[in-house]
């Protein structure tokens, strides 16, 4: 409850990190509260006003924030890994130094969000311009090497996986690279075929970078990443 949070804030010693793991916060107004250095791992916030809340140095790893207002909240140096922020108002949030690996930002409002060079997994993982090489794993453990041209649209969310609108198939090899193949089939769409030397293109490419599981040619920047998928 809000009262429990207030009590923990008042009674904690300097440097103490109160733990609120796997807690459920529902139908309350926490706006403007100073919750720095707290552990909210795996907790859920449902219909909670979190505007201007100070989450500095907090862990909200794998926490659920879907649909709440976090307008102006401070997540500086916070662990935000795999947290869900679907549909959240995150305008003017401070995420400087925060780690957003795997965080879900689908349909979140991100206008004027503040990040810096220390912010992890918020910027595009793949180069935004120029031609690049990519790799993807297909049916029967065939690994496809792709050339993504300079004019191809490309995106990435908060994971190493990327998407592009078109690519040329350079090679198709086995995991150990001892065998080569002429074609390979997508793990997601069995009708999508990659043929050596040919171009593949997705006409209805979704340009929303925060929509991870959507239309596009999914690829990885490193071959080893594709192998472990």
What are these regions (language model features)?
Residues 1-141, 154:
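Tandem repeat scaffolds
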Residues 2-3, 163, 220:
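Low-complexity, intrinsically disordered regions enriched in charged/polar residues
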Residues 12-16, 197, 216:
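Glycine-centered small-residue hotspots that permit tight backbone geometry or close packing
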Residues 127-214:
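Non-catalytic interaction/regulatory modules that flank or connect domains
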Residues 209-229:
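Extended catalytic/binding region for NAD+/ADP-ribose chemistry, centered on the ART fold
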């Amino acid at each position: 409850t809000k009262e429990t949070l207030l009590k923990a804030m008042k009674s904690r010693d300097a440097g103490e990190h109160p733990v609120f793991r796997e807690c459920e916060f529902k139908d309350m107004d926490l706006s403007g509260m100073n919750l720095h250095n707290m552990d909210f791992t795996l907790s859920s916030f449902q219909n909670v006003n979190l505007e201007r809340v100070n989450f500095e140095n907090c862990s909200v790893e794998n926490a659920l924030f879907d649909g709440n207002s976090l307008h102006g909240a401070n997540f500086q140096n916070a662990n935000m890994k795999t947290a869900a922020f679907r549909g959240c108002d995150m305008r003017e949030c401070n995420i400087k130094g925060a780690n957003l690996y795997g965080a879900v930002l689908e349909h979140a409002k991100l206008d004027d969000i503040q990040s810096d060079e220390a912010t992890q997994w918020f910027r595009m993982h793949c180069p935004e311009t120029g031609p690049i090489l990519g790799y993807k794993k297909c049916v029967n453990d065939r690994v496809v090497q792709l050339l993504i041209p300079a004019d191809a649209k490309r995106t990435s969310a908060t994971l190493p996986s990327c998407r592009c609108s078109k690519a040329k198939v350079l090679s198709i090899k086995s995991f150990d690279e001892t065998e080569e193949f002429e074609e390979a089939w997508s793990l997601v769409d069995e009708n999508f075929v990659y043929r050596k030397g040919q171009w593949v293109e997705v006409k209805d490419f979704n340009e929303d970078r925060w929509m991870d599981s959507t239309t596009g040619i999914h690829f990885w920047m490193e071959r080893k990443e594709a192998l472990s998928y």
